């Protein structure tokens, strides 16, 4: 006869979500619904009418984990709307700040999954390594961005200022340390994920989290608006996806690209740019571990290329025509992140919209949990959802 199983809240990720699962008599999920129940804040609406420079300040408050991704997408959307081209060294500093954020965020996720996969005897060493990695990521953001969480140096037109040669040397040294730790983390974690066994001895089904949807990523490490056709992005509401009694609880929109659900994040980037073929929940963990190494290598490349005496910010006026829709694209830790903005001739925001990484993955997670319901939260955690970022709209149907 079957039943409905509700897991509320789901745990060890950012924000508040629930799973509403229709399962058969054997506990196998026949229909999975994953939804945000995080209260709506409505950032996009209260940004309208504000000066353009306020956008990166505001959107970096979406959450405390992804602030750099949103500030970066915001300034790039405004720059696109106003025809502003930041100087090379400003863009390099901005990219390095974003890498620092990911070098903090990915290890944080690996901390959150420790109770699932890491034997108690290994946890002190494992968590110590993670905290050292996170410290480096935060140091990069703090040094370049001006603050480790809400970085004030990310400005429309580039970056507020450069860094000193001494800071460059310190960042490079810390990146070398991070690279060593990241490689140790890969050597430790990959066999665990490939073994598909939880710390209590439970074997994870080989095809847990398998799906046949697409992958969306615009760049291996940063973001590129030229690699996405925005006209193919379609947003729709929970009422288009869930049954009414479920939809009325949901606090997020959804997206399709060219009529198809798309996964974003580490595995999507690996599939697009590194010919990664693995599927399932464990493959996302594997891709994320490898990305730590890729991120720090790119960070060191930027340090080699950066001219600390170069111009960091364009001086163009932040003025638009009120019509052109600017597009800011950034590959956040959790995946493809887009902000859209229109700016009028007085430099004020006339339209703002954020299409956040986790909103791409939420409907896909609901479909990917279709195994035994006791494994559903492991699928959720594999995607490392950041639900506060994904909860900016409310839909009311009377």
UniProtKB/Swiss-Prot annotation:
Protein purpose: Reduces the physiological low-potential two-electron acceptor coenzyme F420, and the artificial one-electron acceptor methylviologen.
InterPro entries recorded: Coenz_F420_hydrogenase_asu, Ni-dep_hyd_lsu, Ni-dep_hyd_lsu_Ni_BS, NiFe-Hase_large
Subunit structure: Complex of alpha, beta and gamma subunits.
Source organism: Methanococcus voltae
A Pfam family recorded for this sequence: NiFeSe_Hases
SUPFAM superfamilies in the cross-refs: HydB/Nqo4-like
Listed name of the protein: Coenzyme F420 hydrogenase subunit alpha
Molecular function terms from GO: coenzyme F420 hydrogenase activity; ferredoxin hydrogenase activity; flavin adenine dinucleotide binding; iron-sulfur cluster binding; nickel cation binding
NCBIfam families per the UniProt record, alphabetical: frhA
Cofactors named for this entry: Ni(2+); iron-sulfur cluster; FAD
Taxonomy, superkingdom: Archaea
EC number(s) on file: 1.12.98.1
Reactions that this protein is recorded to catalyse: oxidized coenzyme F420-(gamma-L-Glu)(n) + H2 + H(+) = reduced coenzyme F420-(gamma-L-Glu)(n)
PANTHER family: COENZYME F420 HYDROGENASE SUBUNIT ALPHA, COENZYME F420 HYDROGENASE, SUBUNIT ALPHA
Annotated Ni(2+) binding sites: 63, 66, 386, 389
């Amino acid at each position: 006869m079957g039943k409905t199983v509700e897991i509320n809240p789901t745990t060890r990720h950012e924000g508040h979500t629930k799973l509403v699962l229709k399962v058969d008599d054997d506990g196998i999920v026949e229909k999975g619904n994953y939804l945000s129940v995080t209260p709506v804040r409505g950032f996009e609406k209260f940004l309208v009418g504000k000066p353009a420079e306020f956008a990166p300040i505001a959107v970096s408050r979406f959450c405390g984990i992804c602030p750099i991704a949103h500030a970066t997408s915001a300034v790039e959307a405004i720059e696109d709307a106003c025809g502003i081209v930041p100087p090379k060294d400003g863009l390099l500093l901005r990219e390095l700040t974003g890498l620092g954020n990911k070098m903090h965020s990915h290890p944080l996720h690996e901390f959150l999954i420790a109770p699932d996969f890491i034997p108690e005897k290994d946890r002190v060493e494992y968590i110590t390594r993670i905290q050292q990695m996170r410290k480096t990521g935060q140091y990069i953001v703090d040094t370049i961005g001006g603050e480790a969480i809400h970085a004030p140096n990310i400005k429309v037109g580039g970056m507020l200022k450069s860094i000193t040669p001494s800071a460059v040397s310190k960042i490079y040294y810390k990146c070398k340390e991070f690279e060593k730790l990241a490689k140790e983390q890969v050597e430790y974690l990959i066999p665990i994920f490939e073994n598909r066994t939880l710390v209590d001895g439970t074997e994870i089904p080989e095809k847990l989290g398998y799906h046949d949807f697409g992958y969306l990523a615009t760049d291996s490490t940063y973001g590129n608006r030229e690699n996405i056709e925005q006209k193919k992005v379609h947003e729709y509401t929970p009422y288009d996806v869930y049954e009414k009694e479920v939809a009325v609880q949901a606090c997020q929109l959804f997206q399709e690209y060219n009529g198809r659900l798309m996964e974003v994040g580490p595995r999507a980037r690996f599939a697009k740019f590194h010919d990664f073929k693995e599927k399932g929940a464990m493959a996302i963990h594997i891709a994320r571990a490898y990305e730590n190494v890729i991120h720090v290598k790119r960070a060191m490349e930027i340090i080699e290329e950066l001219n600390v005496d170069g111009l960091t910010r364009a001086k163009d006026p932040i003025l638009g025509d009120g019509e052109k829709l600017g597009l800011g694209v950034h590959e956040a830790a959790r995946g493809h992140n887009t902000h859209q903005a229109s700016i009028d001739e007085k430099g004020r925001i006339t339209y703002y919209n954020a299409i956040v990484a986790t909103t791409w993955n939420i409907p896909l997670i609901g479909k990917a949990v279709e195994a035994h319901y006791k494994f559903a939260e492991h699928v959720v955690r594999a995607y490392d959802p950041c639900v506060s970022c994904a909860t900016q709209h409310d839909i009311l149907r009377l």
